[in-house]
């Protein structure tokens, strides 16, 4: 049994608790304003907060987090935190730039795309009129009353069944009466479902749908399958209708999804969890604020008055096509506060060194460093991950750009399940975001340093250690650990430090190469063997146990490729018994010869595939070296961009650009490098 309004009620309660300061476990300080919030909600919405909280887990000093007020303004953060809890963003001409920069800093990718679209077209979906809002509120209350009535019927049926079980039944007739008393509710459910399927089969024969039988359904109420007056008071009103099937083309005529006025964005941002575990393929992705409902309607003439209050607006919207978002737009003049060049800088996003065409404006790649959404491209939502709750579920992030599917701001509910993992990976090269395959939780995969180059050949591999994980040679090998595969222990000997070292003890066997990792603390990271500056690192936790796949390891250990299996799988005859997520493999000599600049960078690895630049710390892959370097600054805390007047440093060039134009009073355009103008 599904409860359609459950997610909505939960977030309403969470927002109420936030506004009243109840059960809040963190305080976000922006300037002179304090925002109470819940860690779990912030971490679910923003990978930036998730990285902070995962590193500082158990640290009471992290209960108060201070954000840079020059990058994130208090007004912009207030709008963003309201969006996190309500999925509604107050966006207007006066605050779009501040919201864009704050969302880029906090890695709220869906908000960044909404702001970019607004800056490009100066249009957003209009909010519903006040009359419609009132009507939707009334319908939500009516739906809530129907749900309460359905729950009371369920409880009464359960009580009657318990009473029937307690009464002794020596005679067969009394046993039959008890059975009849226990089973009317399940029998009625089965009968109604069968009748619903027959009606759908009859409707498939009709070429079109009578639009007079379909009207608007409130986005706020839960899905309700309605057929007649008695079904309003049956527990079936709590049951969500069957999910649309990929092969049922004509089902679009009677199973319709509520859409809004305008669509944009990519399908990867329009995901919410399925409320039914039996849907694994294509699914209708619903927004939290708009709660798009699928309405199963019958077309009997006598049931028309009841259906008119629970009906749909767009009856023939195909599955996987355009989905929409809800944004409340302020009524402000549409005059642009920035010149066209700056708008094009914000809306551009280059892949490599190529030019990108955004809404008819061709933008060159040299201006990409100015984009306030640079951190969005360098730390986007994970393309794939494994969710371990009892068993392993593959979370599929669909990237189908052919449908121009739509953008949804409710990024705190992106858990649509899928089984086709390879189809997800085939579309990675088409999406504008340049990151893939990362999780910042305890099971997050990230690269560990390889074994040191042994002098005695393959036999000297066991017991070898790494001198420095960040200054290894170009032809080094790397691995991706996952957890709880072979049951090997991992001993943590020190805390998480900026220059910590991962020692690896290898033991070869006939089926695989197993490793036991132990973290060894080295000396001061500013001296000795470590030749890189010391920065604060935000990185995921070390997995507890790990296993290495060795099916592709040659005999020469100096050129071997160590790959980590991404899923829990056993090995038989040197081959995995079940497929896992794709592994990173070291790039060939030809690719390495073309990427000499990347080999000189710390924490950058060159791998095979279209995304050939990988972060050594967390295994994220990127199309361009610039994006990879920007992402690494999230881990290291490096701030390479300094203001020439006041000396303040920033991690992104867009942050320096805003600081120079708004807060640094001594700024002059002639003193900035040409790349920032």
From Swiss-Prot:
Residues 350-365, 449-464 have a biased composition (Low complexity). Residues 366-379 have a biased composition (Basic and acidic residues). The keyword Transcription applies. Pfam families: BTB. One of its GO terms (molecular function) is DNA-binding transcription factor activity, RNA polymerase II-specific. Residues 24-93 form the BTB domain. A zinc finger (C2H2-type) spans 613-635, 641-664. GO terms for cellular component: chromatin; nucleus. It is found in: Nucleus. Keywords: DNA-binding, Isopeptide bond, Metal-binding, Nucleus, Phosphoprotein, Repeat, Transcription, Transcription regulation, Ubl conjugation, Zinc, Zinc-finger. Its main location: nucleus. Residues 158-181, 287-300, 552-576 have a biased composition (Polar residues). There is a cross-link at residues 239, 322, 330, 404, 415, 541, 594, 597, 645, 658 (Glycyl lysine isopeptide (Lys-Gly) (interchain with G-Cter in SUMO2)). One of its GO terms (biological process) is regulation of transcription by RNA polymerase II. InterPro entries: BTB/POZ_dom (IPR000210), SKP1/BTB/POZ_sf (IPR011333), Znf_C2H2_sf (IPR036236), Znf_C2H2_type (IPR013087), ZnFinger_BTB_dom_contain (IPR050457). It comes from the Eukaryota. May be involved in transcriptional regulation. This is Zinc finger and BTB domain-containing protein 5. It comes from Homo sapiens (Human).
